Amino acid sequence: SHRYDPHTPLEETMQALVDIVRSGKALYAGISNYPYEAAAFAYNYLLEHDTPCLLHQLKYNMLHRNPENEGLLAQARENGSGFIAFSPLAQGLLTDRYLNGVPEGSRAARNFTLKQDCLTPELLEKIGRLNRLADERGQTLAQMALAWVLRDSMVTSVIVGASSVEQLDSNLQSIRNTG
């Protein structure tokens, strides 16, 4: 289930997942963007119907630690579920892209998914401090941010985008610094 829908009975959504797996249209069941209580119901319902929830996908990065703070990482661990992090680079904030302001053509400049007014002086200073720390570690900010997300063995995968092969190669270097 890609997104928790408070307007649809959770039992109905979970039964649909059970039916999809049992019919062979999917191999496994997973959830995405579920709050703690809804995830607890989902884990229990699916397990009771012999279709265990194998993953929970949530936004997770150095600037957005809700899955950790709200107990969702621990909950996944307790239920034998994997955890997939999306937006590990905070829509580009945890890269060198915004270190010198908002570049033309960037997400923030387009004011689409990343609003310019979210880029407060405090946030930009925090990102600058993180960048200096990454530099001291011999990493780019993006590499350090990805390594930070991957440091927890509960994180089974991250969803990361790259606009070039060079960017992808650089991001892959983060796996050398997860220990």
Where do the PLM segments sit?
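Histidine-centered active-site/metal-ligand motif
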Residues: 2
